[in-house]
Amino acid sequence: MDFETQVVLHNLKKSVEVIRRQLDIEKKHSRLEEIQALVDSPTLWEDQSRAQLLLKEKSQIETSLKEFKELSIQLDDLIEMIELASKDHEEETMKDLERELLLLKEKIQKKEIECLFSGEADGNDCLLEIQSGAGGTESNDWAMMLLRMYTRWAEIYHKFQVQIVDKVEGEETGIKSCTLKVMGKNAYGWARTETGVHRLVRISPFDANAKRHTSFAKIFVSPCIEGEINISIDEKDLKIDTYRASGAGGQHVNKTESAIRITHLPSKIVVQSQSSRSQHQNKAEAMQMLKSRLYEIELRKKEEKLNAARNVEDSIGWGYQIRSYVLHPYQMIKDLRTGHEVGNITSVLDGDLDSFIIATISNNS
């Protein structure tokens, strides 16, 4: 076994021990026993909301314990196999094991990042909103590119489920706005640092003179609320509009005014839903979205970051950019908060975002 491999294995053992402490494995086992006792109670379903939350927490703890156990076993087994292959001078076997070691290293690093998700809503599902900036067709097309990027990131790289809650098509191409519901373990924790303005520089495919254009779109991520939360919304503070849900080219999703748009006047937050044919269901979905947005603001207040949250929400422009995507005259995607850069723009636009997210989370931790 060469010295470099020894160092990697030593560091991975340290990382697994750090993960053990951060996850507080012993405490999780104790909590699991407590929940099991509550679940076994005959009065469990007298409060259905509480019962569902308990069962979800139980499932999350079981998954966390299982993943950590598998990670520990994989590392122990790999160390043993590497030591045997090194002792017997099996070079081909060592090459295969080194490839496995790299894959395990990535998995352990990802788990270390997940351990940094200490916010009270980091484990929740989330709403990811995309809104095109000024610029019409150019910005609408950029917003559509971001929709594809985030959908692939969620579904392919994290195996999250993605549901389109609301989508407004552009007049010629692309989208004016779209709201995604991203569902999965730590969905909000992974997505929350994407809130901000994203800038694209490229040769426009819509310009006959092939001139360079700059487009903007903003992303806003808020946690989905689980159970009841103390968010007070006064009916007199709401402006509720109904409209027909429709797509590009006049292709109506349905012919009745079932889509709902709610404006929260004090905060100027606007939410809308057209995912259902039922106006009642769309209103309930929109109200849940509004609560999530207001909850996000409360979380930001606790972290003394309210100004950043509202500035991002209210402004699209140079001042609040978090990431620049340059396709011409050179190719580079750069995060302006951390300085992290990636030259493989195709990979990033195809959903390979984790290096940016990890850099930002690590920088903030």
Swiss-Prot record:
N5-methylglutamine modification, residue list: 251
InterPro entries attached to this UniProt entry: PCRF, Pep_chain_release_fac_I, Pep_chain_release_fac_I_sf, PrfB
Keywords: Cytoplasm, Methylation, Protein biosynthesis
Chief location of this protein within or outside the cell: cytoplasm
Pfam families hit by this protein: PCRF, RF-1
Purpose: Peptide chain release factor 2 directs the termination of translation in response to the peptide chain termination codons UGA and UAA.
Protein name per UniProt: Peptide chain release factor 2
